[in-house]
Amino acid sequence: MKLQQLRYVVKVAECGSITEASRRLFVSQPSITASIRDLENEMGVHIFERTNKGVIVSEEGETFLGYARQVLDQADLLEGKYKGASEQVPHFSVSCQHYSFAVNAFVDVIREFDAARYDFTLREEQTHEIIEDVAHMKSELGILYLSEHNREVIERMLVTNELVFEGLFCATPHVFVCADHPLADRSSVTLEDLEDYPFLSYEQGSYNSFYYSEELTSTFERRKNIRVRDRATLFNLAMGLNGYTVCSGVISHELNGPGIISIPLDVDEYMEIGIITRKNTTLTRYGRAYIDAIRQHI
């Protein structure tokens, strides 16, 4: 097995086509095909399924690619250290639910290391995507929450994917509403107070059950529901429709502006927000710095 073979399979997976990977790598298509075939035979793994539209990664190929990315990242770090720091391009990826403190911490990491070149990724995603990203090593760590409602299901998924959860802090539920919302002057609100207002939540795709929901009180029935995919849309709807969402209460006025406020929600529940990582994996300096930065924002 050679590093070049691993680079080929990762690029083909990204492109979904050997032809496109060949064009981007400036390597002939037959050379890439032969190299991947040799790698599959040597490792005894079937990485790609061939279709008339290109290639797709097989189930066992996803696992292989996760390890391949980790090997390539480590090789890049090694080369950068001993072949000249100027050639090193740091890589760091985080997958998270829609938390402003996660964005602020990401900014802090970039400012702390302030490299001339870097390749960092922050993905705000659906819950199951966060777990898959960390399991397949697309992200070094993920951020999500556990509660009495979802803990059993999420922890089972983590065990299945050889991931571990480390709690960072526990939060009582709050609601985000616009600053001129009719309930904005309340010291706290109840679910009954909110009945007449649209409930805003993050869509979870085919995993759209309360086990994967980002909103702690998703098990309650609402008359008005709106699901979105991104934070900006959710806040725009909150301001335009007097909608609300349930959250941890940690808010960043630097990111969200003064138009959104947080009010305690009067329910007897809590959420434990933490990070997920691969079992027995040592975090990079960027991962460690990111966790330290999060602790400064909560």
What are these regions (language model features)?
Residues 157-173, 177-199:
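Flexible hinge/capping segments at coil-to-helix
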Residues 159-166, 171-172, 232-282:
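Beta-alpha-beta core module
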Residues 42-43, 64-86, 290:
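Alpha-helical linker/hinge and terminal dimerization helices associated
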Residues 10-28:
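Short helix-boundary/capping micro-motifs
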Residues 102-108, 151, 187, 191, ...:
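Secondary-structure junction motif
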Residues 89-153:
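Central regulatory/effector-binding core of bacterial HTH transcription factors
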Residues 40-57:
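A short LG(V/I)-centered, amphipathic sequence patch enriched
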Residues 135-139, 145, 204-261:
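Hydrophobic hinge/microswitch elements
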